[in-house]
């Protein structure tokens, strides 16, 4: 489930910081990414991850970082949040981590072959983050953005998205952005030429894991705890009706965008 942050600056900031108190929940229950994503990333960048100097920005608890490293990349992580950074260090103590964000990268010019933003570019200001990416990338380097999203051609996921929208008043991303160009949203300046791909995958998890994953999204983290808990309790009933065995098949579309500098 990808829930787009509110455009209100104060609410946006509150949501961006909400993950720090839920870092352990985030690390334990958020979905990973499939091998096909990294195969596609290598195809679009025209270079292997093995041996590449990669900066993973907004690294969070290190879900994407660990997979990049497993592909042989030499990774540096950048993370602004205290709680997320602490969880990252517990999970990946041997991976260099610097504190900062994509709007002002604490890195030297032309130091990276690849900048990655796994589930994090939407927390940046593109007017600042795009020039920073171009500054840090080496000639021929690439910027890669990706998000796990919930495709609404899966009936139970569409029904759940509708319930979330009704209960919390959250605009569904597909409703808001269906006619918008993804590249223009990611880079309103038009300086980057993105190639977009979608990689579908799925995982099977217990109902409790799915609910904990859902509850780790900022829209829930900033809600009154009793309100969020009531929604998740009701959601459990819906899920058990759809999956009486107690195991949920979560289907994801990873939306990947790659721009070569």
Q: What is the meaning of each model-derived region?
A:
Residues 42, 66-69, 130, 134:
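A structural alpha-helix within SAM-dependent methyltransferase catalytic domains
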Residues 55, 61-104:
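Class I SAM-dependent methyltransferase SAM/SAH-binding core
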Residues 103-114:
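A short acidic, Gly/Pro-enriched loop at the edge of an enzyme's catalytic core
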Residues 128-203:
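Conserved catalytic/acceptor-binding region of the Class I
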Residues 181-261:
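Conserved Class I S-adenosyl-L-methionine
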């Amino acid at each position: 489930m990808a829930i787009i942050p509110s455009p209100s600056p104060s609410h946006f900031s509150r949501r961006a910081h909400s993950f720090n108190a839920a870092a352990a929940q985030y690390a334990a229950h958020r979905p990973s990414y499939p091998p096909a994503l990294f195969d596609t990333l290598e195809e679009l960048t025209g270079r292997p991850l093995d041996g590449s100097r990669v900066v993973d920005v907004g690294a969070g608890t290190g879900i994407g970082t660990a997979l990049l490293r497993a592909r042989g990349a030499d990774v540096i992580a950048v993370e602004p949040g205290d709680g997320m950074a602490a969880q990252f260090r517990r999970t990946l103590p041997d991976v260099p981590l610097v504190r900062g964000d994509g709007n002002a990268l604490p890195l030297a010019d032309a130091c990276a072959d690849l900048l990655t933003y796994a589930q994090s570019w939407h927390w940046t200001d593109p007017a600042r983050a795009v020039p920073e990416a171009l500054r840090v990338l080496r000639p021929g380097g690439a910027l890669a953005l990706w998000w796990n999203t919930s495709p609404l051609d899966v009936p139970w996921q569409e029904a759940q998205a509708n319930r979330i929208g009704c209960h919390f008043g959250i605009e569904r991303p597909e409703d808001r952005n269906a006619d918008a160009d993804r590249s223009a949203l990611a880079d309103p300046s038009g300086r980057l030429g993105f190639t977009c791909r979608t990689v579908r995958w799925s995982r099977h998890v217990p109902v409790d894991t799915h609910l904990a994953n859902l509850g780790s999204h900022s829209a829930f983290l900033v809600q009154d705890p009793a309100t969020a808990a009531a929604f998740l309790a009701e959601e459990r009933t819906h899920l058990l009706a759809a999956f009486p065995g107690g195991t949920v098949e979560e289907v994801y579309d990873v939306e990947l965008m790659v721009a070569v500098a």
